[in-house]
Amino acid sequence: MLADAQQKILNSSQWLTADQLYTFAVSTGQNLCTTPNEWLSKGMIFSISNEETELFPLYALNPNAGYVLAKELVNIIEVFRERKDGWGMAYWFGSANGFLGGRRPQDLLQTDPEAVLAAAKDEVMGITHG
């Protein structure tokens, strides 16, 4: 069951190794001073481990802004830092979200990053009773 869930996430987006992500970003005109592994250590991106290979989500880069990191991603990662590991974040980004009208956060990260951040905060708050 876990393997099926992981495969679903791997199929939901394009995942790249650190070298592939770096090469991709540079090929689109980025002048990178840091590498994906440095982004990871600074909490600017997340990764998953699949068959001993560290993978990064391509949706973390904004194609409408020259493939720079999505502007709200660091804030979303900060919201989840103490609650979700890389796979936990990948599941969240790749799953339909009721707060987002059934859409997946990864599909809205570029077009409505503020809504995705609000959904992340809602996820952390959980159910509140009033």
Where is each model-derived feature located?
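Non-transmembrane "mature" sequence context
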Residues: M1-G130
